[in-house]
Curated annotation (Swiss-Prot):
Ni(2+) 1 binds at H136, H138, K219, D362. Pfam families: Amidohydro_1, Urease_alpha. This is Urease subunit alpha. It comes from Trichodesmium erythraeum (strain IMS101). Carboxylation allows a single lysine to coordinate two nickel ions.
Length: 570
């Protein structure tokens, strides 16, 4: 005998299904379920008197016989490839399958087997996303990693050695000794980590030795001298060893203008940091490079989105981060040349058009490591409010396309940029199970659970002395996946293929599995998921106005944003 449930009751019991819409936090963004992999009437749910019991939704099948280690039930997945309802099976720390979980002996279409060896996380009522990737990290202090993972970031890429003056300004881990030290330190954290060597050299030998030592890429920074000669040498070495190059260009235009830097690229692929320019780069027109097919452009989060406070805070940040002196007129002029409301406003729109492909933090060096995800969705909200629905959404009720475009900016696209998309960056079978669960009201602000390599690493947790898990104070705390050997067994360290072939991880006794980056040199802007636009960009050198394909790009600064004070009263 069948049983009918109305939509509200069904959603409250098993989560939303096809056609249902969910609001993202307190934004004006709504997503709508496109497909449901579960089976009506055969859904699995854990609890007293519910489905996942022996002989019912739980089979007697052993782990060796095919049962998975963990199932997230009735998950609403938001990823660049879709908005779907499904069960997620996890085995050996990797995503095993997205589909229908249960007991194949009594249920139809089961492709994820629940058995005696299977743990359950209730995904109903939650949005599930891939763990975020922050591809612009100054490794100034290890406490950044705690803040990052608590916000939903599970992979950090950048450079540094701690609060050294060089690291405070540049994302470089220079030389073999420093690279090995940082690789060894990485074992202590439930975080995928990769380090960029210093790329500033007109001769290749010093760059090659860093790649051989284990750098996953190279970083060119103007504070070390990003000249055309250094750019050319760095990209030549990267091409030879299949690693990515990130660049912070010459703000002062000392060694050349943006056209000279573009010429030095010679059509070779490169990741441009803070491509708008407030974080650094040819003043006032570095933003032009986002039109190039070989440039993979990202933003850093202090300019995301453009608000009434953006300009004022940037001047002070810049003086500190780049070791400038407010009493030296030239230093003040340097700072002021980088902060332009016109290009920051244009950056908002270029993100909405899909011309900027990624967002990262620039942690403690003009960026906030715990706000990559928040700032991304605030930008999406601001653009929805100011620009309306996107052209591709005109036939849709919800904001699915915009949501997919923006989530790609801190998940799959930085993974592709840096050659790690085989391992992380999306909810897909075979990838590391780095997964965030969000209550819709808290989406993008405070994750409920952060799963790292199949283990719960951080989670919202109440008083440990309470009789149940929920009494106040409830806040993000490290869980068992963040301790002991679990930190290394559930994470990855990214290195060059050259270092892996030379068995550097074994030589320096790394506990975290090391994997090589790949496919970094034969990609282009066209490979950036939903963020591949290459409009012709023009910048007026006197007014700083930005035009894309002849259209003036301008918008008002936001006076109020969602995902702010109401979420952070405590």
């Amino acid at each position: 005998m069948s049983y009918r449930m109305n939509r509200r009751t069904y959603a409250e019991t098993f989560g939303p299904t096809v056609g249902d819409r969910v609001r993202l936090a307190d934004t004006e963004l709504f997503i709508q379920v496109e497909k449901d992999y579960t089976t009506y009437g055969d859904e699995v749910k854990f609890g007293g008197g519910k489905v996942i019991r022996d002989g019912m939704g739980q089979s007697p099948i052993s782990r060796e016989g095919g049962a998975v280690d963990l199932v997230i039930t009735n998950a609403l997945i938001l990823d660049w490839w879709g908005v779907v309802k499904a069960d997620i099976g996890i085995k050996d720390g990797k995503i095993h399958k997205i589909g229908k979980a249960g007991n194949p002996y009594i249920q139809d279409r089961v492709d994820i087997i629940i058995g005696p060896s299977t743990e359950i996380i209730a995904g109903e009522g939650h949005i599930i996303t891939a763990g975020g990737i922050d591809s612009h990290i100054h490794f100034i202090c290890p406490q950044q990693i705690e803040i990052a993972i608590a916000s939903g970031i599970t992979t950090m890429i950048g450079g540094g050695t701690g609060p050294a003056t060089g690291t405070n300004a540049t994302t470089c881990t220079p030389g073999q000794w420093n690279i090995w030290m940082m690789l060894q330190a990485a074992d202590a954290f439930p975080m995928n980590l990769g380090f960029l060597g210093k790329g500033n050299s007109a001769k290749p030998e010093g760059l090659i030795e860093q790649i051989k030592a284990g750098a996953m890429g190279l970083k060119l920074h103007e504070d070390w001298g990003t000249t055309p000669a250094a750019i050319d040498t760095c990209l030549s070495v990267a091409d030879e060893y299949d690693v990515q190059v990130a660049i912070h260009t010459d703000t002062l235009n000392e060694a050349g203008f943006v056209e000279n830097t573009i010429a030095a690229f010679k059509d070779r692929v490169i990741h441009t940091y803070h491509t708008e320019g407030a974080g650094g780069g040819h003043a006032p027109d570095i933003i032009k490079v986002c039109a190039l097919k070989n440039v993979l452009p990202s933003s850093t989060n202090p300019t995301r989105p453009f608000t009434v406070n953006t300009l004022e805070e940037h001047l002070d940040m810049l003086m500190v981060c780049h070791h400038l002196d407010k009493n030296i007129p030239e230093d003040v002029a340097f700072a002021e040349s980088r902060i332009r409301k016109e290009t920051i406003a244009a950056e908002d729109i270029l993100h909405d058009l899909g011309a900027f492909s990624a967002i990262a933090s620039d942690s403690q060096a003009m960026g906030r490591v715990g706000e990559v995800i928040i700032r991304t969705w605030q930008t999406a909200h601001k653009m929805k409010v100011q620009r309306g629905i996107l052209a591709s959404e005109k036939k849709e009720v919800a904001d699915n396309f915009r949501a997919k475009r923006y989530i790609a900016k801190y998940t799959i696209n930085p993974a592709i940029m840096h050659g790690i998309a085989d391992y992380v960056g999306s909810i897909e079978a075979g990838k590391l199970a780095d997964i965030c669960l969000w209550k819709p009201a808290m989406f993008g602000v405070k994750p409920e659970i952060v799963i790292k390599g199949g283990a719960i690493a951080w989670a919202q947790m109440g008083d440990p002395n309470a009789s149940i898990p929920t009494p106040q104070p409830v806040y993000m705390r490290p869980m068992f996946g963040s301790f002991g050997g679990a930190t290394s067994s559930t994470s990855l360290t990214f290195v060059s293929q050259e270092a892996l072939d030379a068995e550097i991880p074994k030589k320096i006794n790394l506990k975290t599995p090391a994997v090589a980056v790949s496919n970094t040199r034969n990609i282009s802007k066209a490979d950036m998921k939903l963020n591949e636009a290459t409009p012709k960009i023009e910048v007026n050198p006197e007014t700083y106005e930005v035009r894309a394909d002849g259209e003036l790009l301008t918008c008002e600064p936001a006076y109020v944003l969602p995902m702010t004070q109401r979420y952070f009263l405590f």
